[in-house]
Amino acid sequence: AFRFEAAEGRLQKIPSVSTIPDSIQERTGFSTAEIAIHPSGKFLYVSNRGHDSIALFGINEQSGKLSLKSVEPTRCQTPRHFVIAPGGKRLYAAGQASGTITAFTIDSKTGRLSFNKRILKVPKPVCIVFSRPISSTPKKP
């Protein structure tokens, strides 16, 4: 992990952290995939393939240091990608191997995820994107 030193215009290396709880010893086949920072800038989320979870880290505003807060099961297999919805209140995880998208509510104070008990069947989802509505009226030059 790195912290950007704006005054000097350089990156400073900061210690790496595990995205899997220390209690998990066997990690064969585990890898991280998506990384996203909550719009508040206070929380960082990382998806874990193999462990099928999303790790939540708190971000220290002064040092940029990460501290593991929780690891939430995604309730889908191989969470290749996830997205934080505009507004920062929801997170959606794409389970490539399970063919599902699962939904979570984000606690605005703690960043913790709560499963919404919503599972959408989709053939091999690998990415979720929110976009703005497309206007049918052309813009004037």
Predicted regions and their residues:
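Feature marking well-ordered beta-strand scaffolds used for ligand recognition
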Residues: 1-141
